[in-house]
Structure formats: structure tokens, C-alpha cells
Amino acid sequence: AGLDLGAASXFGALAFEGVA
């Protein structure tokens, strides 16, 4: 999920991965 959202958001990966 982190990679999917990150690719779409660009910077979302960093925030998502940190939370996950």
C-alpha cells in the first residue's frame, strides 16, 4: 500500500511508509 500511494502522491511514500 505504501508504494502504491507513494507513487501516486510522490512524497506520500515517505509519510505512508513511516506510518506503516
From Swiss-Prot:
Protein name, please?
A: Antifreeze protein
Induction remarks: By low temperature.
Specify the species.
Answer: Antarctomyces psychrotrophicus
Q: How does pH influence this protein's activity?
A: Optimum pH is 9.3.
Q: Which domain of life is it from?
A: Eukaryota
Q: Which GO terms describe its cellular component?
A: extracellular region
Processing after translation = N-glycosylated and O-glycosylated.
Tagged with keyword Secreted: yes
Protein location: Secreted, Extracellular space
| Free-text function comment from the UniProt entry | Antifreeze proteins bind to the surface of ice crystals and inhibit the growth of these crystals, this inhibition causes thermal hysteresis. Causes the shape of ice crystals to change from hexagonal to a bipyramidal shape with rugged facets. Inhibits recrystallization of ice crystals.
How far does the signal peptide extend, from start to end residue? none
The record's keywords, sorted A to Z, are: Antifreeze protein, Glycoprotein, Secreted, Stress response
